[in-house]
Amino acid sequence: MALNSEVMFREQINAMRSQAGRKRATSLQSFCSGNTDDSSADSTDNMDMMVDYPQQKGVSCMRARFNSESTLSKSFRKKVKKLAQKDRRSKERLNGNSEEDAIEVPRGAPSTYAAPSKLRKSKALDCLVSEKPKDEGRSEDSGHGADIEMAKGHFNDVRMKVFAARTAMQVEPALVMKTRKALEMKNAVLENHQSPGAFSLHAAYKIAASAESRVGSITPCNKKVTKEAMANLIRSSYDDTEITQELLFSSKFDSKWKGRYTDIYMRRDENGKKPKRPVNGQGWVMPLKSICEKFGINSTFFTNHRIDLKSARDQVLLMRLLSHDQTSTWISDIHPEAVKNETLAEYLLRELDASTMQKRVQAFKANVLADRDRVRVAGQFYNNIRIGKRMFGAARKAKYLSTIIGGMERRFEILENSVNHIPFTHSASDNNQEKCRNPRVHCRDSTRIALQFPRGQYLGDFIHANRISGKPLFNEFIMTQAPMKNTVDDFWRMVWQEEVPYIVMLTSRKEPERCEYYWPKSPSDPAVTVPGGLRIENFGVYQAPDPLFRVTHLRLIGPDREERHVEHWQGDVNNSSNMYSPLNILRLLRNASKPVVIHDHLGVSRAACLVAAEIAICSLLRGPTYKYPVQRAVQFLRQRRPFSIETPMQYIFVHRLVAFFFRDVIGSAKELDVDYERWLQERSERMFLDDLAAPIPGYRLLSPRADPDIVRMVGRPERPNYRREAPDCVGEMPNKVAAVDGILSPAKSVFEF
C-alpha cells in the first residue's frame, strides 16, 4: 500500500510538470517580489524541492497536498504564502528598508535600479530555502542592484553631479573632451600602478610636466619598461640626479627595482674606498641614499631597516619640506644686500614684544574656534520624523551643525557683499584690454606699476601688476597675471625697473594657455631679447630642497652691459593639503630687501593666498590687534589688488596657513582639522571637471579648472563699481520720484500715462 501511494505521488508530480499554460496556483513569482498580480511563467524544471519545503532536519516535513486536478490544495498554498511573507518581512527588517525610509526621488530623475525580472519556478523555490535571487546578467558587485542602501548612496552621488555637469559642460566643453582623451592615453600606464603617497605632492604629475626628456626618450610612457631599458636608466642615473629622482618618484618603475642594481652604485670613490653595502638590499636603496646625501638628509632609517619604497620616499620628501635651508647661495653671493631685509632684522632684535605677540596669537585661535555658524547638513534629518501632515511645506526637520568652517564661509560672504566693496578706478586696464587675460579682473590705477624703462623711449606704461606694500608687511610684493605673448617684453621691463631678485611662478609650465614660457628653458636655449637693449640668459637649474619648486638662475644684461641676477622659482602650488611649501617660499621672500614678483594665472587666486597669509602673519607679529586678522588681511590686499581671494576654499586655506605657521605657539587646532575634513567630505560630492586620473582630486585644489563656486557666477553681470550703503531709514516710505525719465527706458518713455 505504501508503495502504491508513493507511485501515485510521483505520477502526480510528473503530471504537474507536463501541464503547460495552466493558471497560477502557488504565486511563485510573489515569493520574491511580493506582487500577487504577476502571472506565473511556464516551467519544466524539477519540482522535487516542493516536497521538502521548508527544510527541517530531524523533524517531519510538511507534505504537499494535491487536488484531483493535479494542483496544490488551498490549505497548502496558504501556508506557503504565509511563510514567504514572513521571510520577506524579516529580510526587510535586517536591511533596514521600510516605507518610512523611502527615498525622495526628484521629479524627472532617472531610475537607479530596476524591478526583478520574472523567475522560473525552481529559482523561486530556491529563494525560499536559500537566499534572495539575483537578476540574470547582473554581477554581485554591481552598484545599480536592487539593494536600497546602495541606491541611496548612488542617488547622493548622482543628483548634484547631473545638474553640475550640465552647467559646467556649457562653460568648458573642450575641457571634458580633453580630459577624456588624456585619460584614455594614460589608462594603460596608470592601470596597475599606485600613487606615490600624500607627501609626494603628485610626483607622477610633476615628472610628466618636467622638461626633462631623457627618460622619456629611452622608455616612452605608453610602453612597458623592459629589463634592458631599466638597466640603461640605472647606469645613466649614477651621474645624473634628475634621472635618479624621476626613477624613484614615478610609480611606473616601482615594480622594476631589483637587488642586482645595487652593485651599479657600489663604485669606489676618489680615495679608492668602496661604500658599505646597506642592510636593506633592495635595488632602490642606494639611488635614494645618493639623493639624501645631496640634501643632507639622514638615510639610516631605510638603509638599516627593511621598509618599502613608498614609505621611504614619502619620509624623504617630508624631510625635504621641513628643511629650513631653502635658499641657494647663488644670488646671496652675488648680491648679498638683496637678500638681507634690514627692516625685519631691526624689528626682531629691538622692537619685538614676545609676550604681546603670544597674546595676539592666542586670541586669534580663540576667535577662530568661537566664530561658528549654523550649517544645514545635506541629506540628514532628525530621525527621519515628519513634523506635519500638510501637503506642502517641510516634510522632515532638517539637521544643523555649528561649525568653524561655516563661520569662515560667512566671513567670506561678508567680504563679498557690496556693502564692503571698495570702489576704485581702472582706466588704464580699460584702455589696454588686449593686455588683460580676463576683462572682468581690472587693475587698480592707484597701485599699478607704471613702466618707465627704457628711458627716452616710450613703449607703453601699462602692465597688469599692482604693488603690495606698507605696514604690517616687512617687504614688498608685486602681484601680476601670468605673462602673455604680447606682454612678455613688458614683464621683463618691470623686472629690470624694480630690481627684482626673485620671481615666483605658482602655475604649471605645461599649460601654455594659462602662462606663456617667458624665460629660457635651459642654458643651451637662445636668450630672450627685449626692446630697449635687455637680454635674459639661463645660467642653470638649481635643485631646491623643496621638491615642489624648480629654481632657474637667470642673468639679465642691460643696455650699458650692466648685469643683474634673478632666481626664478616655479612650482604648481595647487594642493590645499601642502602647508610646508607655501611657508617655505614666504620665508625666502620675507628676507628680500627689494620687491619680489609673484604671479599665477590671473594674479588673484594662489598668489593672493600666499600674500594674504603673509599679511596676517606680520599683523600678528607686529600688530595692531584685530579680532579677525585674516579678514582684515584680505581687505588690506583688496585695497591694492582688487578681486583677490576668489573662493571660500582659498579663504579657508589662508586661515590654515596662519594657524600652521604659529603651531609652536598655539599648538594644533584639532577642532579645526576635524571640521575641515568634514567640510572636505561634503565638498567632494560637488562636481569638479578636472583630470580624472590626477593623484589629487579636484575638490582639494585651491583653483580647479571648473570651480563650482565660480561656475555659478557665469552669466551674471559684472559687479558694479560702487559701495552700497546700508539702509539707515528702515521702515520709512521711499522718497517720491521726481520724474519718470530716470527709471524708464528710451523706448518706453515715449508713451503717455
Curated annotation (Swiss-Prot):
Domain named Tyrosine-protein phosphatase: residues:
408-661
Pfam families linked: Y_phosphatase
SUPFAM superfamilies assigned: (Phosphotyrosine protein) phosphatases II
CDD domains, A to Z: PTPc
Write out the biased-composition intervals (Low complexity): 35-46
Where would you find this protein in the cell?
Cytoplasm, Cell cortex
Q: Known InterPro entries for this protein? A: Oocyte-zygote_transition_reg, Prot-tyrosine_phosphatase-like, PTP_cat, Tyr_Pase_cat, Tyr_Pase_dom
Name the major location.
cytoplasm
Q: Name one GO cellular component term.
A: nucleus
Task: Summarize subunit and interaction data from the UniProt record for this chain.
Answer: Part of a complex, consisting of pseudophosphatases egg-3, egg-4, egg-5 and kinase mbk-2; this complex is required for the oocyte-to-zygote transition. Interacts (via tyrosine-protein phosphatase domain) with kinase mbk-2 (via 'Tyr-619' and 'Tyr-621'); mbk-2 tyrosine phosphorylation enhances the interaction.
Q: Which family does it belong to?
A: Belongs to the protein-tyrosine phosphatase family.
Q: What is this protein called?
A: Inactive protein-tyrosine phosphatase egg-5
